[in-house]
């Protein structure tokens, strides 16, 4: 009897633990209602899920909603749920259904209903938001029925799609996603670092551009005449993709999506020999040549036509409807100036640099960031041979594959044409494209939120304030740096919490006068940050109308359950 009672009590003790262990995967959905209409729940159903959606999401509010699949059945489970909202008061019937699916992979989807459509998403569209365990996916709908709504899943070529609205605006007046340490989507050479504590992106630059990034943080390092990207603290860290690979990614994107403005922001340059944190003028020239002769759509400027501050000129200065893309390279103020005029890119076959047999061949698929011993790429990973006597500073040759798609199409036209012009490649000193803002240097998401919102308020009192760069990244905790067996403590793992704070908190700081121009993040793995920022292109929202008319308009409100 005593043994039976003991077994019974033991069973009661273990059952709750078992339930906790077998609890299913969950996450968060951020619903941002940036329309003048309340969203009213008219239908909901769930099977084996936590799925408690609010009856109403008022106009101009946001709602963070938790959801959870009860059972982890892998890619073929039958847990699922739906919640349908209608836009109350919309002149044309409009609704959407939030769907949770498990079969063929867990994901959250948005199914448009009635006559609802948005920029790039026609009536009846199905938008896949994806899913990240304990992370956040975003659905935003902005605007009203008098024009096109702006929503999740924006067009890949979003600048061309919104050019009628943003063309007359300057870089100070629009918003763009920015890739933090964009070249660190793989580790090619290791110097005491591994992917867990040096890799900041899970997809390469091409895919980051597809997902909407237009400002790329590129950190060049030269080793024996070859250019890489880096994530280093002193001499500790790792090299990422080569500059040649990044050039190929950009050329591929601009060929497929003409008319987009891309800024490469060169920072944290390094000379691997003796770990010098500055480049020599000769090395800068090598890098300039590699970029200028490699990039198909390198923008050129007429110094006589433009002001010193390029952040104040209209976007249509750089790209126009149907034009080719424009790639600008922003360099530190201490970098030497490029030569005043440039050679014709259309060189003969004998004049072109030869192929680089060491060019990387990494794919554009998401990489396994959790393997400490597997590094994509074909370079030596332990830094061996770096300290050999090798003073070969021969400039890196440009692979034929970079220039294979080069065209001789007309460069974007510049305003106020003159009879005599001197064009120079757009290597722009930082002071000519000034930015404000700084990263928070914290491993605490709440501090990150407060710090970035404070800086947003401080640096953006008006739409004509300098470009504000809002950096939503988590600094890896010291104890997490060697914890390579735990993906959640990696740099990309930390991005989950940073993204959640961004999606839930940024609305508190937004108005028609106060908004970030750049949102810089780790792990741009989908287009949801682009969707968030594309709401800036909506004209005549209720908030803007109220502010222009001098009437009261409440701040965006949270309606968390």
What does each of the following model-derived ranges do?
Residues 1-23:
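Fungal secretory targeting signals
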Residues 233-299, 303, 323:
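Intrinsically disordered, low-complexity acidic segments that are enriched in bulky aromatics
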């Amino acid at each position: 009897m005593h043994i039976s009672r003991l077994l019974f009590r033991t069973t009661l003790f273990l059952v709750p633990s078992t339930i906790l262990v077998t609890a299913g995967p969950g996450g968060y959905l951020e619903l941002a209602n940036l329309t003048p209409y309340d969203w009213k729940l008219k239908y909901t159903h769930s099977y084996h899920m936590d799925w408690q959606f609010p009856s109403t999401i008022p106009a101009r509010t946001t709602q963070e909603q938790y959801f959870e699949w009860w059972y982890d059945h892998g890619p073929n489970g039958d847990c699922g749920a739906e919640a349908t909202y209608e836009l109350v008061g919309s002149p044309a019937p409009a609704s959407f259904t939030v769907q949770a699916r498990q079969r063929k992979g867990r994901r959250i989807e948005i199914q448009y209903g009635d006559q609802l459509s948005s920029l790039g998403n026609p009536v009846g569209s199905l938008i896949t938001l994806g899913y990240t365990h304990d992370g956040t996916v975003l659905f935003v709908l902005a605007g009203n029925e008098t024009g096109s709504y702006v929503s999740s899943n924006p067009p890949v070529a979003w600048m061309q799609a919104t050019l009628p609205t943003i063309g007359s605006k300057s870089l100070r007046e629009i918003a763009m996603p920015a890739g933090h340490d964009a070249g660190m989507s793989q580790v090619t050479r290791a110097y005491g670092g591994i992917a867990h504590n040096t890799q900041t992106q899970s997809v390469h630059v091409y895919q980051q551009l597809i997902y909407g990034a237009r400002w790329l943080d590129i950190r060049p390092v030269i080793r024996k005449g070859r250019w890489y990207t880096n994530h280093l603290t002193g001499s500790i860290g790792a090299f990422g993709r080569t500059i040649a690979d990044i050039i190929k990614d950009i050329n591929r994107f601009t060929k497929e999506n003409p008319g987009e403005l891309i800024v490469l922001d060169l920072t944290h340059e390094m000379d691997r020999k003796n770990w010098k944190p500055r480049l020599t003028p000769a090395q800068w020239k090598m890098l300039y040549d590699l970029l200028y002769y490699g990039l198909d759509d390198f923008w050129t400027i007429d110094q006589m036509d433009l002001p010193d501050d390029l952040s104040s000129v209209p976007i249509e200065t750089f790209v126009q409807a149907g034009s080719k893309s424009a790639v600008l390279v922003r360099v530190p103020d201490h970098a030497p100036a490029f030569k005043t005029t440039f050679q014709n890119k259309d060189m003969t076959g004998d004049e072109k640099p030869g192929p680089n047999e060491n060019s990387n061949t990494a794919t554009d698929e998401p990489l396994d960031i959790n393997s400490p011993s597997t590094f994509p790429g074909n370079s030596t990973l332990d830094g061996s041979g770096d300290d050999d006597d090798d003073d070969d500073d021969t400039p890196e040759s440009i692979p034929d594959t970079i220039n294979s798609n080069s065209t001789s199409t007309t460069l974007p036209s510049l305003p106020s044409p003159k009879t005599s012009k001197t064009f120079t490649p757009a290597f722009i000193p930082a002071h000519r494209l000034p930015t404000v803002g700084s990263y928070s240097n914290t491993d605490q998401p709440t501090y990150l939120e407060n710090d970035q919102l404070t800086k947003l308020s401080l640096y953006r009192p008006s739409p004509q304030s300098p470009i504000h760069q809002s950096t939503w990244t988590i600094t890896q905790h010291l104890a997490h740096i060697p914890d390579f067996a735990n993906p959640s403590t990696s740099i990309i793992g930390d991005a989950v919490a940073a993204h959640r704070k961004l999606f839930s908190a940024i609305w508190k700081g937004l108005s028609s006068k106060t908004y970030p121009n750049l949102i810089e993040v780790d792990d741009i793995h989908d287009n949801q940050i682009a969707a968030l920022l594309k709401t800036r292109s909506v004209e005549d929202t209720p908030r803007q109308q109220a502010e222009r008319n001098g009437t009261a308009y409440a701040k965006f409100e949270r309606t968390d359950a």
